[in-house]
A protein has these predicted regions:
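N-terminal secretory signal peptides that target proteins for export/translocation
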Residues: 1-14
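Bacterial N-terminal signal peptides
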Residues: 18-30
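Beta-alpha junction/loop-to-helix N-cap segments that form part of ligand/metal-binding clefts
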Residues: 40, 55-62, 74-145, 154, ...
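Extracytoplasmic "Venus flytrap"
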Residues: 44-65, 87-94, 116, 183-191, ...
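Extracellular/periplasmic Venus flytrap/periplasmic-binding protein
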Residues: 97-98, 105, 141-143, 151-256, ...
């Protein structure tokens, strides 16, 4: 791997992530110097490589860059290579905002990405001056509703996953008077899950039976599970990450809470190993249903997933049995994000700018990911690519998530 770390004006180290470097290293490393980089098209991300959500950031970057390597191997776009510049914001909102300005003003990035929901909300008022399209690993509904000219949700939102889970309880399970609770962390990410739960329960004219907070630094959920048990909750919306899901299922069993737990998008950021490794893990897995807006790496019958798997095997030199070691977490999300940005770049013409790329994204209609997601469409008043999700159960024997059915359109 060609790696060069250099100091720009001001003495701050920065790392260039080239699409020709190995994708595992791309989550951490660097690519090239200024002269070469100026000849390439550039996207940029204020990522988390060392903070509490570094798991998301590293896997997202790996998936993004596998797709760029495929694009560059085929000749790039307009004869130029496409690369990803990555800075480590370590889940710090102020650093994310600072890097966004840098991407536009110093690095000539054509589009930018950040990690946090809080950062996305803080950045929205700044984008008219920064003037590059903005996306995030977090996918809150409020990022795209109401629509903002520069902010895009490529995927169905956290709200969509919550709505689908509650609809499943009422319409598929058939419980017309369910006691539903919600577990969420503090901050904007958590509030998105709480708001969505309250809003969907209002549709069915039922109250939320219990609302409990589990912070990002908490590793024990006993107190929260006791509160849910006291409220006689039978279904729980868990708007959190995968490691917290494992703790919640473990401690629910410990206190005797018998319930079905619905995990939203980031709840499946780990493979089921964390759940299955808990005491009685196979039984815990039976109580979990995941809800997410992109297909899983193991759904190999889906054409787009098959192509993605082949690309990973080619560039990582691994066999089928090891694909899960690379394509877990937010890998698929990063891969699809790159697909959308490259398609917009192709439509933006030979001299793209942030504004031209934004307008090209706005013109995308029914962009086909070959089944990794539903078709993706944007418009002047539409900044969310689709509103459909899948529900997943854990196959304990294979240690993978498997879909219960097809795409469920959320209305």
């Amino acid at each position: 791997m060609c790696k060069r770390i250099f100091r720009p004006a001001g003495g701050q180290q920065r790392r260039w992530i080239g699409a020709l470097a190995a994708s595992a290293a791309l989550a951490f490393g660097a690519f090239t110097g200024t002269a070469v980089a100026q000849e390439n098209y550039r996207f940029a991300i204020a990522n988390d490589l060392s903070g509490p959500s570094s798991f998301h950031g590293k896997t997202f970057a790996a998936g993004f860059n596998i797709y760029l390597r495929e694009v560059n191997d085929a000749g790039g776009v307009n004869g130029k290579k496409v690369e990803l510049l990555q800075e480590n914001a370590a889940r710090d909102v102020q650093k994310e905002l600072g890097f966004l300005r840098k991407f536009a003003q110093q690095d000539n990035a054509l589009a930018a990405m950040i990690v946090t929901t809080d950062g996305l909300f803080a950045a929205k008022p700044l984008m008219e001056s920064i003037k590059v399209p903005l996306m995030a690993i977090g996918v809150p509904e409020l990022a795209s509703n109401p629509p903002h000219p520069w902010v895009f949700n490529i995927f169905a939102s956290y709200q969509d996953t919550v709505f689908a889970a509650i609809d499943y309880v009422f319409n598929s399970i058939g419980d017309k008077d369910p006691k539903i609770g919600v577990v969420y962390p503090d901050g904007q990410f958590g509030l998105e899950g709480l708001r969505a739960t309250e809003l969907r329960m209002q549709k069915y004219r039922k109250p939320v039976a219990a609302k409990v907070v589990m912070g990002f630094r908490e590793t024990d959920a006993t107190t929260q599970m006791l509160a849910l048990k006291q409220a006689s909750v039978k279904y729980v919306i868990v708007h959190h990450g995968g490691s917290w899901i494992a703790a919640i299922l473990r401690d629910a069993a410990k206190v005797g809470l018998e319930a079905t737990f619905f995990g939203t998008t980031q709840a499946m950021d780990r493979e089921p190993d964390l759940i299955l490794s808990q005491p009685g893990g196979q039984n815990l897995a039976k109580n979990f249903i995941g809800v997410g807006p992109w297909s899983k790496w193991n759904e190999s019958s889906i054409p787009g997933v098959a192509v993605m798997r082949a690309a990973v095997k080619k560039h990582e030199k691994i066999e089928d049995a090891k694909l899960g070691d690379v394509m877990y977490g937010n890998f698929v999300q990063g891969h699809v994000n790159a697909m959308v940005l490259v398609e917009a770049l192709r439509k933006a013409g030979p001299n793209p700018t942030g504004e031209k790329l934004r307008d090209a994204m706005s013109r995308l209609r029914n962009f086909d990911t070959k089944g990794i997601t539903p078709p993706i469409s944007f418009g002047p008043d539409r900044r969310k690519g689709f509103s459909a999700v899948k529900l997943y159960r854990i196959n304990a024997e294979r240690k993978v998530y498997e879909p219960i059915g097809g795409w469920v359109v959320v209305k």
